[in-house]
Structure formats: structure tokens, C-alpha cells
């Protein structure tokens, strides 16, 4: 474990060991919190926690993104196509493709971005 009582909003770039409970969740919209878990210039890992009914608004960005559903259920729309995803499912969103979601059962998404999302730091 990390140093007891040490909390941060964001780990350092290229920080090798990041302990979940030391990264404070940051607001990321109504009913959504975000934890940036690790990143380099070329890669970023982000945990997003959603309350039931929370929305990840449709958007696009110049990053390829892989989303792994850790828990819960979501209606995901990617490039105009909507699917229900649950724990264990994975979604690939190529750069520039519009995507968003609605959380239908409270849950957690793990996002991997390449390159890193500079707007998250």
C-alpha cells in the first residue's frame, strides 16, 4: 500500500505505483466521478463511476478509447449505434467517432485512451 494519509487529485505523469484510495474522485458531470489512475504522453487509464441515470453526453475527441465495463449496465451509443453493455463487456471507440452513454444500473467504467487526454490533467 501507499503512504497512509496521502491523497491526490491526480497521480504524477509516469507514476509507477498508484493506489486507488489515494486518488480522490473528481466531479465529471451530474452523477459521475472520475479518477485518473495512470498516464504517460501516449496512454491514459481512467476510472469513471456512474450513478443510475447519469449520462455521458454524446461527444468525440481525437483519441482512440477502449472502455471496459467493470460493473453496472449502460446504454452506449457509438457512431449512431446503441447497445446495452454490462460487467465484462468492452467497447472500442476510434478517434473522432461520436459516442456517449446512459447508466441504467449504477456502475464503473475503466477507460484507456491513446494518446493521453490532456484535458483530464
Give names to the regions the model predicted.
Residues 95-119:
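Ligand-binding loop in jelly-roll beta-barrel domains
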Residues 63-74, 79:
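Glycine- and acidic-residue-biased ligand/ion/polar-headgroup-sensing regions
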Residues 80-95:
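Short acidic-glycine-tyrosine-enriched beta hairpin
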Residues 44-60:
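Conserved short histidine dyad/triad with adjacent acidic residue
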Residues 2-42:
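A short, N-terminal "cap"/entry segment at the start of jelly-roll beta-barrel domains
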Residues 55-56, 72-77, 90:
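Short beta-strand segments in beta-sandwich/barrel cores
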Amino acid at each position: 500500500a501507499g503512504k497512509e494519509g496521502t491523497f491526490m487529485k491526480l497521480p504524477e505523469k509516469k507514476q509507477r505505483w498508484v493506489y486507488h484510495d489515494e486518488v480522490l474522485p473528481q466531479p465529471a458531470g451530474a452523477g459521475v466521478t472520475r479518477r485518473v489512475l495512470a498516464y504517460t504522453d501516449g496512454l491514459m487509464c481512467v476510472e469513471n463511476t456512474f450513478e443510475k441515470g447519469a449520462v455521458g453526453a454524446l461527444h468525440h475527441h481525437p483519441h482512440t478509447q477502449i472502455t471496459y465495463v467493470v460493473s453496472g449496465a449502460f446504454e452506449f451509443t457509438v457512431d449512431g449505434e446503441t447497445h446495452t453493455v454490462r460487467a465484462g463487456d468492452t467497447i472500442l471507440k476510434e478517434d473522432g467517432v461520436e459516442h456517449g452513454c446512459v447508466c441504467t444500473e449504477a456502475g464503473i467504467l475503466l477507460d484507456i485512451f491513446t494518446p493521453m487526454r490532456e484535458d483530464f490533467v
